[in-house]
C-alpha cells in the first residue's frame, strides 16, 4: 500500500480521482491521456480498532499535485466544514469488482411512499440519478448513504462491496422511519451554539469519557513530539475547541473542583464516531476524576518549562492480588520504570499510574532478556500511586511536576489502599487490550442482579462503618455455566478488588495426614497479606468441591474425620477474615452443592443458583461473543458477523449449552469462515473482513452437539420428519393439540389454565411409538432427551431419585425439550409389587410423580412422552390428569390404505421399478403386520435387490473377461468398466414378493386381540 494525501470533494459524484504522480506509483507510467476508469482500494486511519477498506471507481485528475487521492464526501457522509483526515493508504485494484446478487436499500418513509407509485424501471432510474450509480461501474457497499438523509444501503449480497448490474442485481427497497433524517444529520461547525457576536468562553463544563483504545499518531494534528506525554492527551470536536478558543495541540486544564490536571488537547478529525459534546481522555486521566461525570476545561496559560523537576518521588503500590505476587514484581517494576522515563511525563501528588504487564512471561523475565526485543502481550494491569514528592532542598510539592531520569530519584515503597476504577467510568480493559469479560444485563440474568445487589449492599454497609460479614455460595448442577465470569464481571463493574483462588490447583501433599491443615494454611497465606490493603474486596474460592468430600459416602473413619475438619476449618476462615477485615466478602462456587458440609452452609448467608442459560440469556451471550471487539480479540484476522445471522435462531438451536460451549461454537465458526475465505481478493471485496455467516455457525453448533451431547448427556434435536411416518394421521392431530398450542400461543395459558404436558403412547411393539416421539421433537424444533430405565438405578440410597431429578433439570436447561421414557413400565411399575429390598422402584415412581406434577404449572416448554407395551403394569397414579393424561393407542394398520401409506413412507428414498405397485403390495399383506414388520419387509426387499444386482454383476464380469480375454476382478471391473446403471439399485416387485413370502409377523392374532382388550379396558375406564 502507498501512503497518500487525502482530500474530500463536495461534488455529488461517486467517483474518486487520483493525481498523475499517485497513478504512476500504483499502476506504472501513465499515458498522456487516460481514457478508461480504474479502481483503487482506500483505507482511512480509524479511531477504532476495526478499519475497513473501500474500493472506489476512480479517474485521473491532472489538477492534483503530488501523491493525492480525492474522495467524494458522501463515501462517509463527511462534514466538509470540520477538520478532516488528510492521510490514507491506497492500493491498485487490477481486477474488476464482482457484481452483487442483491442490494437492500432503506428509504426514508415519505420518499418510499412516492417511489411505490412508480414502476420498477422508474425507481431504478431515480436511484441511479440521485445516487450517481453507474451501471456495472460504481462500487457500492453496506452502510453507504446514497444521498443523505433519504437512502442508505443496508446490505449487499454476497459481498460487503461490489458493482450493481441493473439487469442482474436484485434491488430491494425497505421503508425506513421518519427518524432517519435526524439520524443522518451531520455534526459540523454549524451546530455550534455561538451567536454571531459571541466570542469563545474561558471555561467549558463538558462530559468526560474514557477512550476505548489509544489513538494512532497519524490522527494527531498537529503531529505531537515523540517525547510528549501521550497518557495526558485528550480529544474533542472542533466545536469544543472553537468555544474554548484554543487550537489543536494546545495545553488545557481539566478540573472538577477538587482535582485539577494538565492535558494536551487534539481535535477529532472527520470521519469519526465520537460525540461532539464530550471530551475523551486516557484511563490515567479519567481515573483521577472517577467521582465526576463532567469536568471544567480551560486553557492552560503556563509553560511546560516552568513546571518544576522533582528531586525525589516516592511511589507506592496500590494493593491488589497481582501487586502482591513476587513472581510479577520484576516485570512490573521494569514496565513502571519504562513508562515514567520513556516520555516527558507530568505528574501530580496522589496520581494513580496504570502499568500493564504480561503475566505469562513474568516467570521468565530478567534484566538480560529485557535488552532484547520481545513481543509482549500484556494481559494484566496494576496501579501505582504518587505518594510524596520533594523538590530541591526537600521542599514538598503539591502541584504538577516533571520527572527527569538524570535528576529525579524514584523510590517504590509501602502499599496504599485504593479501589480500582469502575469499568463503567474508566474502561481500562478496552483501552489496554486486556481480555474482555461478559457484562451481565441484570434485566435478563436475574441471578446476576441478585449477586450484584448483595455485593453493592455489602460495600455500602462498609462505607457506613457497618461490618455485615457477607458470604455467598454460587452453585450449579452443570459445569462451566459462568460462575467465575459472574464474579469477575461484577467486581470490574463496581470497582472492587478481587482475590481469586482456584482450589483445584491447591495440592499441598493432599494424601498426607494433615492435608486439611496444609490447604487451609495455604489459603490463609494467599489472602492475609493482600486483605489489609484491598478493602472492600471479594475473596473468591472457586471449585469448593475440589477440597471437600461427601461425608455420607466415606467409610474410612480417618477420612471422615478429615472431611468434617475441612468444613469446620473453612467456616472458621470465613468468620475470622470477615471480622478482621471489614468489607471483605467471601464468595465460593461449586458444581456439587450436596458435597458442601453443613458447617460451611450454615456460615453462608446467601446461596445463588447459576443455571444453564435460558434462550433469552443465550441471545445475550451470542450477541456478546459475536460483537466486533470480542470476536477480534487477539485475532490475527479481522472477523465480522454477516447480515444473514439471526441471533435468536442460534439461541434456539443451542438449547442446553453453556457459555463455554457457545464460546467454542464461535471459535469453530471462525475456523470455518477462515477456511472458506482464504483468498486475498475475497478479503478485499469484504472490506478487509472475513464474514461469519449462519452456515458457519450452524455447522459449529452441529459439531458441538455431535462431539459433546452423548458424553455430557445434552439433549439434541433428532432428524425424523412426519414424512417418515405413515398411517398415524389421527394420532398426529392429537399431538398437535397437546404440544403445538402451548408453544404457539403461550398467552392462552397465562391466565392460570393448566396445560397438558404428558402423553403416553401404548400399543403392540413395533407400531412406531419411539419414531413418533422423535418426529414430535423434530417438527416442533424441540430437544429430545431419551431416558432408559437402568440409567436411573444406583446402588447408593437416594441416588436413584436424584438421577430422576437430574433428568428433569437437564431437560429444563434445554427447554424447549421432550423427555422420552421408553418402556415406561420398567421405570414406573405399580408400587408395592416389587421385590427389591430397599424399595428403590417405589421411590423412583414417587419422585417421577413429583416431577410430573411440576410440569403443568412451571414447565413451560417441557413435555414428557412415555411409551409402553403394557400400560396395565403402570402405577395408576401416573395416569391421572396432570401427569400422563393424554393416552394415545398406536395400533396395527387396519386398512390397506394405511398400510400403503406406511410403505410409501418407508420407500421414500428407494428407487422403485415401474412395475412396483405399493397398493397391490399392501392389499396382499395381512392386518397383523406392525410398522416394524413393514420396515423389515422393505429392508429385506432392498437386500434382495442388492443380491440380485450383485449376481448380475458377477455374470457381467465373467462375460467381459471371456469376450476380451481379461482377468478383471469385480473391484477392477467397477473401477474401469462399470457404468452408473451398474451401481444403481432398483427395487422390483419380485423383491417385495420374495421378502413378503419369507416374513413372519412379529405379533400374532391372539396377541393383537390381547392388546385390543387392554385398549378397550383403558378407554372404558
Swiss-Prot record:
SMART domains: AAA. ATP binds at residues 763-770. It catalyses: ATP + H2O = ADP + phosphate + H(+). It is found in: Cytoplasm, Cytosol; Peroxisome membrane. Its EC number is 3.6.4.-. One of its GO terms (molecular function) is ATP binding. Keywords: ATP-binding, Cytoplasm, Hydrolase, Membrane, Nucleotide-binding, Peroxisome, Peroxisome biogenesis. Interacts with PEX1; forming the PEX1-PEX6 AAA ATPase complex, which is composed of a heterohexamer formed by a trimer of PEX1-PEX6 dimers. Belongs to the AAA ATPase family. This is Peroxisomal ATPase PEX6.
